[in-house]
Amino acid sequence: MINIRKTHPLMKIINNTFIDLPTPANISSWWNFGSLLGLCLIMQILTGLFLAMHYTPDTATAFSSVTHICRDVNYGWIIRYLHANGASMFFICLYAHIGRGLYYGSYAFQETWNIGVILLFTVMATAFVGYVLPWGQMSFWGATVITNLLSAIPYIGTTXVEWVWGGFSVDKATLTRFFAFHFILPFIIXALAXVHLLFLHETGSNNPTGIPSBVDKIPFHPYCTIKDILGALLLILTLLTLTLFXPDLLGDPXNYTPANPLXTPXHXXPEXYFLFAYAILRSIPNKLGGVLALLLSILILXFIPMLHTSKQRSMXFXPXSQXXFWXLVADLLTLTWIGGQPVEHPYXXMGQLASILYFLLILVLMPMASXIENKLLKW
């Protein structure tokens, strides 16, 4: 009997992606984050869809419509907070996924890695425009500050900012277009994720040793499906705990004040997941320089395959590279903390040091550590 799972054009794709996919036998829990990101995306699209049914993208009613969702819509409060905290979970999974790729040398799959970098930019753009929609103080001023960065571009800057705003300030037109972007981008992300997966399945997954694992493969189902379900349950548990016990833990109190163009909040600061980039932006005294550093802090990921000097793919057996990697993680956590602090004496200088260290680690120290290891191993 011919198995429909393996012959039907549509079922065949699903089968080769989630069922009969040959998977390395030794991949660790760090390989769970890909499926968790897929789960996050589906969850965000679904909660977002239900929020969009009750939201009005208009300066006069946006803030009230969010309040209406929380108070009058059945289970609106949980949909709203799942969506807001789901974004934080999305970024936690995203950074873990990228960290895994850096540590185990998964960036050697160049197409997969480059599409991943594009995905990161798209998700960041989506999160930014989404944060503007509730039209609170932080939404409004966040939009003003970040879109204003375009004005740092020489000659065309000012025109470009007014073009993005659709006027001479962040106003009705800006909110409406941001809602349109926020609605369309997740579907673009879904398409890009499929392409990301397509390129990954051309080569097969990497594994913790960084050695080709064609000799030792297992079917994805049931081994990895059950493992992914466990990861998903832990993700849902974390998200629900956060949403039901401390929904405003990661939010900003200033966003419970309706947007007012005449009064600036004490400290404009982005959401938890953008603080490291914000700290890098702030640490450079020049506007254009700051914008370039901000862009480069993410774009640098695309250059990592070119900076790989080691004769080994993974960092699993390379202690000096590990030290540099964990120093980078600590540096990013430091930047995240500083991004949330006011621009005062100790923080300003610490932010500058942490920003310099960030680029130094990636561009100089990590490639150097790999070169030293090669020498020590007489390779």
Swiss-Prot record:
It holds the Pfam family Cytochrom_B_C. The chain crosses the membrane at residues 33-53, 77-98, 113-133, 178-198, 226-246, 288-308, 320-340, 347-367. One of its GO terms (cellular component) is mitochondrial inner membrane. SUPFAM superfamilies: a domain/subunit of cytochrome bc1 complex (Ubiquinol-cytochrome c reductase), Transmembrane di-heme cytochromes. Gene3D superfamilies: Cytochrome Bc1 Complex, Chain C. InterPro entries: Cyt_b/b6_C, Cyt_b/b6_C_sf, Cyt_b/b6_N, Cytb/b6-like_sf, Cytochrome_b, Cytochrome_b_C_euk/bac, Cytochrome_b_N_euk/bac, Di-haem_cyt_TM. PROSITE patterns: CYTB_CTER, CYTB_NTER. It is found in: Mitochondrion inner membrane. The cytochrome bc1 complex contains 11 subunits: 3 respiratory subunits (MT-CYB, CYC1 and UQCRFS1), 2 core proteins (UQCRC1 and UQCRC2) and 6 low-molecular weight proteins (UQCRH/QCR6, UQCRB/QCR7, UQCRQ/QCR8, UQCR10/QCR9, UQCR11/QCR10 and a cleavage product of UQCRFS1). This cytochrome bc1 complex then forms a dimer. Its cofactor is heme b. Component of the ubiquinol-cytochrome c reductase complex (complex III or cytochrome b-c1 complex) that is part of the mitochondrial respiratory chain. The b-c1 complex mediates electron transfer from ubiquinol to cytochrome c. Contributes to the generation of a proton gradient across the mitochondrial membrane that is then used for ATP synthesis. It is a multi-pass membrane protein. Heme 1 (or BL or b562) is low-potential and absorbs at about 562 nm, and heme 2 (or BH or b566) is high-potential and absorbs at about 566 nm. Heme b b566 binds at residues 97, 196. This is Cytochrome b. A ubiquinone binds at residue 201. Binds 2 heme b groups non-covalently.
